[in-house]
Amino acid sequence: MALRIAVLRERAPGESRVALTPETAKKFVALGAVVAVEEGAGLGAALTDGAFAEAGAEVGSAAAVVKDADIVLGVQAPDTAALAGASPGAWVAATFDPFRESARVAAYAEAGYEALSMEFMPRITRAQSMDVLSSQSNLAGYKAVLTAANVYGRAFPMMMTAAGTVQAAKVFVMGVGVAGLQAIATAKRLGAQVSATDVRSA
């Protein structure tokens, strides 16, 4: 019997991401898995139900998608109620935030589901393809600078015009991890003067 992989629509307010793309769904289908995606799961990320269907995934209601699922993929872990009908001992791969959401972790244990908290995936070469934090931190650093530029209300680069000279914005980045490095690169590309600090020595 083929492995059944389910993807539910994210329920958290303001969450527009989806745990699977049609491209990856197509790869899973090619490997012999059955992929089921809830209707509208990808709309927030501009991925249509039709795109998932073309990739070979089943598209349906939440109950139909999760029925007999062996693996459930999520950006944020769904409540156990949303997993009703999944196979006993089903694996759920998502971000769980277990230290703040201990009640949800306890509910998973009581229901008999295997919780794979993807944010704790070790940052080693072998696990690089499953490193959810790096990809999201990269985007966070990029978006942080764009948001700051929008709030700043003036131009980032130096501009010499007939009306006078506008000095380049000075951007200070605290921390040069994945997000910080992307923030530095984005601010530099926008023309700002950038400096940074980190708790680690150079």
Please annotate each region the language model reported.
Residues 2-107, 111:
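An N-terminal-biased, well-structured beta-alpha scaffold segment characteristic
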Residues 2-4, 10, 80-170:
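Glycine/serine-rich phosphate-binding loop and adjoining beta1-alpha1 elements at the start
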Residues 8-47, 155-202:
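Glycine-rich phosphate/diphosphate-binding loop of Rossmann-like nucleotide-binding domains
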Residues 9-12, 47-50, 65-70, 122, ...:
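Short linear motifs at secondary-structure transitions and domain/linker junctions
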Residues 54-55, 134-135, 174:
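Alpha-helix boundary/capping detector
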Residues 67, 139-142, 146, 181, ...:
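A broad detector of short, well-ordered amphipathic alpha-helices
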Residues 77, 139, 177-178:
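Residue-level detector of alpha-helix initiation sites
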